[in-house]
Amino acid sequence: INSFNNSFFRGFETKQENNLFVAENKKNINEESVLISEIIIEGWENHPEGRKLELAAYDSMSIKPGSIVDNRILNQDLNSIYASGWFSGVKIKSQDGPLGVRLIVDVVPNPILKKVELKQINSVISSAYVDSIFNNYYGTTLNLNEFQNKIEIIKKRYEEEGYSLLRINSPDRISDDGVVILNV
């Protein structure tokens, strides 16, 4: 194994520790790296589009089984999963296993989008117009990136109506039942 380790993990000092294979980055001895043997995504199981969300979480990650990672890479992947727009929360836990570290990624999916409402002072834009913007997304998991793109369409409509300085604030809270209220 040592000859394999020496050629495969160039730039790392390898050692066996508590039945785990540990690779330490020689450039920064304070940062310990570990071999990832398995990645499990949890939290999507009871969601109507769960399988799609599980794949979205996997696709957002740079870490794959067999990767050697440190905390910096874990944090990057945690942020990447969250930045995908599909999840309102993400946590990464680890478990020691016989072949390395098992990563358990616990995700909290956004709800299924049911309705978007504008809380506005005057009714320049109708709720029917708002529904026409979001109609294709009703009944699907709320993706905050796609949602932001739709808000930009509404802002442009306000500009066309002469309200160029108008701001649409992101929702303070998204209800669990999928109703989003935007403050205008």
Model segments located where?
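Periplasmic polypeptide-binding modules associated with outer-membrane biogenesis and secretion
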Residues: 2-184
